[in-house]
């Protein structure tokens, strides 16, 4: 029997934990010695769930849906689908296809709920479907004149295509200039802090993909057909049902971490990697720092990194070269320059627990609450008059996220900013007052007296951005690929705005078959810039 291969995984988010489990499951502990280094005390990265005074807050909102059925099956093996109605299912008389033999969410905690997606856009004090559609409600809210202008604008875009060398042109080609100016221009600038004309079209190629007015119309037509469509046939932004853990996405990743430890993975928290040491063209060890500033070196055969590319490059031989190794040296100056220029958008979410909503449920969708609350999971605030980018109503994600789900409403306000700017540096008291004032101006609540409790969370490097030195990513990728035993995975590890399922599929632990959709996506993105390839951890797998 050969010696075990030692694998060091940097990061306990979706990509890192997926890699750890895929390596260690089914007797993998006999082949691999796996260590996960997580820089915080929580698991799941941006997919974690924050607990506050009996209520739970989902950081960013995470629907469990994938076009890859293997990912869906993977989630289901961690948290089985509900086999009985949840609290709100029973109270509202909702029907779902229950999983035969599945757990009862009223009596068991390890369970995945089936949820109905409702998301809308708030613009000019009106609600529109999300993604934007040509529904009667949309046409009524826009009015006849604006609808005609938007319609002719879209027709023009069908026959006069712009070069897709930036995100602005990408959107105009799919929605027309009028709808772009209404719903995409200001919101994109709010999200990224840059005008869409300054952002690479790569972001649209990856995140928007097949979404367009024609895509929306096609989806509406297909919904009228009796044939049930598979996940792969539905544009991700248009899905109507998704899965969601009883206690939020963090519950799933906490369960995966627990399973990993039980199977033999060594997991270290408060272990922030500060140096990556190389010897003779390969990574030989990493140095991590604990919460008290103590540093420890950990050697390995293979290294899987989900830490931000900027931090990874700066960590390479950060303390100086090993004098006994000829080619042990820090990253070249030009690579460091590219890495340091990679932009990120940081994120602040403010949770507000309120007594009532001023906003009324005018839909036909039944909801909890007294009076019944609006049915939205998300409300996208496209209106440029507000800084908040998106609202989450946690009651509608899972009734088990809210301590008193019948008599209180737990809302998350999502703000995009940059670490160190004036909004990021606001005190929790001031940012809470600001959030309350925005909800009041939007007429979501009556005023400050409605607020019972609040909580602020700040997230660094939440969104890898597609401008500045991003255009030189191919050079940085080539440099990192030169380390034959280093594999960059996940959203920040690849500097790619992945969904959670994409981060899992590109986990670096074992080669996964690329389905047709992924191949098409890769081709579209590579028209603009080479992306990090999927690679197998050849030696340990």
Language-model features: locations:
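Beta1/beta-strand and adjacent pyrophosphate-binding region of the FAD-binding site
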Residues: 2-15
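Conserved Rossmann-like nucleotide-cofactor binding loop
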Residues: 15, 42, 310
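Short, well-ordered alpha-helices that flank and scaffold nucleotide-derived cofactor binding pockets
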Residues: 21, 25, 258, 314, ...
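Mid-domain catalytic core of redox enzymes
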Residues: 245, 271-429, 434-443, 479, ...
